[in-house]
Amino acid sequence: MLGPATFLPLTAALLLLIPGGRAQFPRQCVTPEALRSGQCCPGLFPALTPDPADRCGASVGRGRCAPLQVDARPHGPQYPHDGVDDREQWPTRFFNNSCLCAENFSGYDCGSCKPGWVGVNCNQRVLAVRRNILDLTAQERRRFIAALDLAKRTTHPHYVIASRRYAEIMGPDGNSTQFENVSIYNFFVWTHYYSIGKTFLGAGRESFGGIDFSHEGPAFVTWHRYHLLQLERDMQEMLQDPTFALPYWNFAIGGNECDICTDDFMGARSNFDSILLSSNSVFSQWRVLCESLEGYDTLGTICNSTEGGPIRRNPGGNVARPMVQRLPEPQDVALCLEVGLFDTPPFYSNSSESFRNTVEGYSEPSGKYDPSVRSLHNLAHLFLNGTGGQTHVSPNDPIFVLLHTFTDAVFDEWLRRHNADISLYPLENAPIGHNRQYNMVPFWPPVSNNEMFVTAPESLGYSYEVQWPSRALNFTEIITIAVVAALVLVAVIFAAASCAVHRSRKDDVHQPLLGEQYPRYSEEYERDASQSAV
């Protein structure tokens, strides 16, 4: 989380935290010359090298310009239009060379450090700790909300977004590239939108919607993990605080109340319109990016930096779907964590006994696929019933950040509990974009799914503080325990009865041979102690 108020100013060395990968592209790479060359290998002159011809920090041993590696293995049958979409074999439609960084160096120009490392030589460890937003102090909470709002209003210092497909990227005159500035938070929104958009098949043809590079497949957890890491690192740089961490919302609390939908947290309901946010929350002033999905799909345009209407939210208010009027239960998380397989064929939203499909929310918490079920991540989104419940615009509601941070915490805990290794992730035949070695769309420089299939504290520079629920007993287990308890009780009663019978028999054996009317030896001795005891 944000460091305490007494946090010392960072040295210039610690400020080398330029994020390691982003989308769309760095400003240096969107000139007509760079796009025509297919190379995006900016240099570090004059910041870190005196060589004006430097590329990727090669002159100081930080990296080199190298051909891109892309996944060419077969994808699943869900997408039949190979060769049409700009996002296929990402990012080769735009570039075929990028910076390949050495050791702990990272970034589009190798000028920054890998997650978890800081310093001029990227040799100092740092760990950001993600905590429950309800556990933050009032000061920490206010600083986090203020930081989000600042990110919404601050132009991204490094990256720009495309406003046209590749076929139109050079502009009407063939020499005016179609990219726009965007704020840090809206950049986060735009990358999510770009990953889920339909495939444009041409004017007058219906766009193809059976494609999603960040949902309904194995990459759901890896893509969103990097998506969050991107925002966190952007905000660390903005705040000049390498310990800044995104908090999480534990949405698995059951019931029909949103415990963070208050003005102290993420915004209460407006007193004047129940689907808008209270004017006492800064988030009521936020405007939504990428709303006009229909226009994008039919005209082949791409969402640009233009904002639209306000955030809408009506938690638990979808009366037409009672099943999404309640949040997931704590036991849903416990059950999900016990699902042993990461993913199962067809590696899609109808996979059964798949941890990924379970945490995404297309299966029952136990892992069994049921087309009528929406659970965990999906249920939390649908419960919000507004901007946060619509996939293409959901990141506009800042609750998205907290919801997905908790989802990532579940993923990280599953990796730890199951000692998961990359062999569990499908190498091929997953939906397009979801194979193990596919470069996640639209991050730059390229980041593959397998790079995010690791435990976070050891590899990604952050950890979680979470108390995980224990799993409740199911009906069969309760019956089994009851039967065993009954058998134990019967055994105890039988043992007690046996002991009583045994004691009774033992007492019979030791009954005196003489009755009470006969004097005992001791009595005779006591009456005449002078007589012989023989």
UniProtKB/Swiss-Prot annotation:
<feature type="binding site">
    <location>
        <position position="381"/>
    </location>
    <ligand>
        <name>Zn(2+) B</name>
    </ligand>
</feature>
<keyword id="KW-0503">Monooxygenase</keyword>
<feature type="binding site">
    <location>
        <position position="192"/>
    </location>
    <ligand>
        <name>Zn(2+) A</name>
    </ligand>
</feature>
<keyword id="KW-1133">Transmembrane helix</keyword>
<dbReference type="InterPro" id="IPR002227">
    <property type="entry name" value="Tyrosinase_Cu-bd"/>
</dbReference>
<feature type="disulfide bond">
    <location>
        <begin position="101"/>
        <end position="110"/>
    </location>
</feature>
<keyword id="KW-0862">Zinc</keyword>
<feature type="disulfide bond">
    <location>
        <begin position="56"/>
        <end position="99"/>
    </location>
</feature>
<keyword id="KW-0472">Membrane</keyword>
<keyword id="KW-0479">Metal-binding</keyword>
<feature type="glycosylation site" description="N-linked (GlcNAc...) asparagine">
    <location>
        <position position="385"/>
    </location>
</feature>
<keyword id="KW-0470">Melanin biosynthesis</keyword>
<dbReference type="Pfam" id="PF00264">
    <property type="entry name" value="Tyrosinase"/>
</dbReference>
<feature type="glycosylation site" description="N-linked (GlcNAc...) asparagine">
    <location>
        <position position="96"/>
    </location>
</feature>
<feature type="disulfide bond">
    <location>
        <begin position="41"/>
        <end position="65"/>
    </location>
</feature>
<dbReference type="GO" id="GO:0030318">
    <property type="term" value="P:melanocyte differentiation"/>
</dbReference>
<dbReference type="GO" id="GO:0042470">
    <property type="term" value="C:melanosome"/>
</dbReference>
<dbReference type="InterPro" id="IPR008922">
    <property type="entry name" value="Di-copper_centre_dom_sf"/>
</dbReference>
<feature type="disulfide bond">
    <location>
        <begin position="113"/>
        <end position="122"/>
    </location>
</feature>
<feature type="disulfide bond">
    <location>
        <begin position="290"/>
        <end position="303"/>
    </location>
</feature>
<feature type="topological domain" description="Lumenal, melanosome">
    <location>
        <begin position="24"/>
        <end position="477"/>
    </location>
</feature>
<dbReference type="GO" id="GO:0042438">
    <property type="term" value="P:melanin biosynthetic process"/>
</dbReference>
<dbReference type="GO" id="GO:0033162">
    <property type="term" value="C:melanosome membrane"/>
</dbReference>
<feature type="signal peptide">
    <location>
        <begin position="1"/>
        <end position="23"/>
    </location>
</feature>
<feature type="binding site">
    <location>
        <position position="215"/>
    </location>
    <ligand>
        <name>Zn(2+) A</name>
    </ligand>
</feature>
<dbReference type="InterPro" id="IPR050316">
    <property type="entry name" value="Tyrosinase/Hemocyanin"/>
</dbReference>
<dbReference type="GO" id="GO:0032438">
    <property type="term" value="P:melanosome organization"/>
</dbReference>
<comment type="pathway">
    <text>Pigment biosynthesis; melanin biosynthesis.</text>
</comment>
<keyword id="KW-0812">Transmembrane</keyword>
<keyword id="KW-0560">Oxidoreductase</keyword>
<dbReference type="InterPro" id="IPR002049">
    <property type="entry name" value="LE_dom"/>
</dbReference>
<protein>
    <recommendedName>
        <fullName>5,6-dihydroxyindole-2-carboxylic acid oxidase</fullName>
        <ecNumber>1.14.18.-</ecNumber>
    </recommendedName>
</protein>
<feature type="glycosylation site" description="N-linked (GlcNAc...) asparagine">
    <location>
        <position position="175"/>
    </location>
</feature>
<keyword id="KW-1015">Disulfide bond</keyword>
<feature type="binding site">
    <location>
        <position position="404"/>
    </location>
    <ligand>
        <name>Zn(2+) B</name>
    </ligand>
</feature>
<feature type="transmembrane region" description="Helical">
    <location>
        <begin position="478"/>
        <end position="501"/>
    </location>
</feature>
<keyword id="KW-0186">Copper</keyword>
<feature type="topological domain" description="Cytoplasmic">
    <location>
        <begin position="502"/>
        <end position="534"/>
    </location>
</feature>
<feature type="binding site">
    <location>
        <position position="377"/>
    </location>
    <ligand>
        <name>Zn(2+) B</name>
    </ligand>
</feature>
<feature type="disulfide bond">
    <location>
        <begin position="258"/>
        <end position="261"/>
    </location>
</feature>
<keyword id="KW-0732">Signal</keyword>
<keyword id="KW-0325">Glycoprotein</keyword>
